[in-house]
Design a protein with these regions (language model features):
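Extracellular/lumenal glycan-associated surfaces
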Residues: 16-34, 56-63, 69, 79, ...
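Non-Sec secretion/translocation targeting segments of pathogen effectors
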Residues: 24, 133, 148-156
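OB-fold/S1-family single-stranded nucleic acid-binding modules
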Residues: 72-73
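Short, flexible domain-boundary/linker segments around small modular repeats
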Residues: 1-17, 31, 37-67, 85
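Eukaryotic compositionally biased low-complexity/IDR segments
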Residues: 88, 116-132, 140-149
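A positional "C-terminalness" feature that preferentially activates on distal terminal regions of long
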Residues: 95, 103-128
Length: 156
């Protein structure tokens, strides 16, 4: 049975992220780990790439979770990569059509249904995260030199 027929029968597509298989579930707006279904990656937590056709996020390979860069990150994570995956139309054009009440074939001319995809991985040293961490380290040093800034920055 071909992939499109399987999809129309309800079999969800999968994507490989750093060697981990994830089920694409656009109804729930998430990628669900095939081996550990409680490990989910929410599409809402991902950033749209500049081209508007992909999502970007930092992925912790060990914990199988999205890694959020924040102002308190002062060390570079050891088991993480920058991940790029297609947007919803690239991941599951049939699922997108169903989400909006359209026919299953609606998006297929521009977005053919394909075999499970594989995420593009970029090492952290080429991701911009090291520079972000260095900037956070500098801010931390400034805060340590002026204790009032720590109180001001941490207050709600």
């Amino acid at each position: 049975m071909d992939l499109l027929k399987q999809r129309k029968m309800g079999i969800l597509p999968e994507i490989d992220i750093a060697g981990h298989a994830y089920t694409v579930d656009l109804r729930l707006n998430e990628l669900r780990n095939v081996e550990l279904p409680n490990k989910k990656l929410s599409l809402d937590e991902m950033v749209t790439a500049p081209n508007g056709r992909h999502y970007l996020f930092f992925y912790d390979i060990e914990s199988r979770s999205i890694l959020h860069a924040s102002s308190d990150m002062v060390t570079l994570p050891t088991n993480a990569v920058l991940v790029e995956i297609p947007d919803e139309l690239g991941l599951d054009p049939v699922g997108m059509a169903r989400k909006y009440g359209l026919s299953d074939e609606y998006f297929l001319k521009m977005h053919p249904y394909e075999k499970a995809g594989k995420a593009t991985l970029t090492s952290l040293d080429k991701s911009g995260l090291p520079e972000f961490v260095v900037a956070n380290q500098k801010l931390l040093q400034q805060d340590l030199q002026d204790p009032q800034k720590i109180t001001f920055r941490k207050s709600p």
